[in-house]
Amino acid sequence: MNLACVLIVAVLFLTASQLATAASYARDKQEYPAVRSSDEMQDSEDLTLTKECTDDSQFCDPNDHDCCSGECIDEGGRGVCAIVPEHV
């Protein structure tokens, strides 16, 4: 009877120590999971909602009109984004 009690206590102790180790390991791996997931969501929304344009004086596709200035000057199949002066 005494040996059975010692074995039960030993098993309970080992189980408790394993649970404590697993909980601290999981806590270290998931630092602020809600903040991280909302940051990932924000990044994915930024990628889908923003359209990048080609800067002035950079090469562009005359058929696509992807210039920030809105004007791609055709240079024989390859275009250059027009430089538009800013209004002061």
Curated annotation (Swiss-Prot):
Subcellular location: Secreted
InterPro entries from the UniProt entry: Conotoxin
Any GO CC annotation of this UniProt entry: extracellular region
Superkingdom in the source lineage: Eukaryota
SS bond list: 53-68, 60-72, 67-81
Keywords: Disulfide bond, Knottin, Neurotoxin, Secreted, Signal, Toxin
Propeptide residues according to the Swiss-Prot or TrEMBL record: 23-52
Main location, first listed in the record: secreted
Tissue-specificity statement: Expressed by the venom duct.
Role this protein plays: May act as a neurotoxin, but produces no obvious effect on ionic currents when tested on the mouse dorsal rooted ganglia (DRG).
Assigned protein family: Belongs to the conotoxin O1 superfamily.
Domain notes: The presence of a 'disulfide through disulfide knot' structurally defines this protein as a knottin. The cysteine framework is VI/VII (C-C-CC-C-C).
Name of the protein in its database record: Conotoxin VxVIB
Organism (species): Conus vexillum
Lineage of producing organism: Eukaryota, Metazoa, Spiralia, Lophotrochozoa, Mollusca
